[in-house]
Amino acid sequence: MRPWLLLLVGLSSFFALSTSVNRAKNSGSDFDLESRASTTNVHSILSKRKLRAFGGDTNTLKDSGKARREEKVWKLFCSVFLQLDDKKKCMFETNQVSSHQPEPRPALSFMPGPKPAHSLVPESKPVRSLMTGNAPVRSIATELKLVLPRITETVKNPSKSQVVMLWLHKVADFSKSEHGVNTMAYRTLYEWLSPSFSDAKLAKFFVGLREDEALRETAEKMLAYMLIKSTSTEAVGRAWLKSGEHPSRLFESMNFKEADFKDTVFLGWLKYAS
């Protein structure tokens, strides 16, 4: 074969190969454009495909193995062909797992030291009634199981019973409230304790309660009422002397009237003042 003929055949083959490569590139570009355009409708395509193959007509879904294979193929199509970053977008709704994570429980904090005062009192109806000033003092004591031995220990050493002292604070609040004006809670307390304690012991106890600012007024009223009810003023007089209370302050707390000036209580105060 002549050289020029071989050259012609070679050039023809080269041009034919170049043309086929260009056509392949052009067709690939068109295909890429179509695939990118189809991503805008991917959710509708997925829904139709899913509904037709898995969820739309249960009568057409006979073979579970085929369904699993279809699902794997479809996920592969989503992840490779459409090149989605989040493969969960291609998961079927029937197989989706909720990504919601429950909020962690708050850590329990165990604080060292004594509990707050309110935790010493059980949450019961009488206690809540006392908080609002509606319950008798005796019913609260019964609910809190403030039996006489416990009260006895408190009278001997008030610092050892936080519950009883808290209850006494409620007695003071109750006596100052609108509901406690007529019930005179401090009188009830004295009448409850007087059968078990001597006047000297109660006088010392009430004088000691005056050191608590919240119980000062109630303690003074209890002392005054005790002096009125007591058969002897000596115990109260000794308690007054020990406390060093000024006579004018005692006179105000006793709330004497003109008719009381001839009473033994007034005479006892006069003896103390002199």
Swiss-Prot record:
Highest rank taxon of the organism: Eukaryota
Q: What's this protein's function? A: Secreted effector that completely suppresses the host cell death induced by cell death-inducing proteins.
Q: Where is the protein localized? A: Secreted; Host nucleus; Host cytoplasm
Record field: transmembrane? none
The short motif RxLR-dEER is annotated over 49-72
Q: Which UniProt keywords apply?
A: Host cytoplasm, Host nucleus, Secreted, Signal, Virulence
Q: Which residues form the signal peptide?
A: 1-20
The Gene Ontology CC terms held by the record are: extracellular region; host cell cytoplasm; host cell nucleus
Name the gene. Answer: RXLR144
The record's similarity note reads:
Belongs to the RxLR effector family.
Q: What's the record's remark on domains?
A: The RxLR-dEER motif acts to carry the protein into the host cell cytoplasm through binding to cell surface phosphatidylinositol-3-phosphate.
Q: What is this protein called?
A: Secreted RxLR effector protein 144
Question: What species is given as this protein's source?
Answer: Plasmopara viticola (Downy mildew of grapevine)
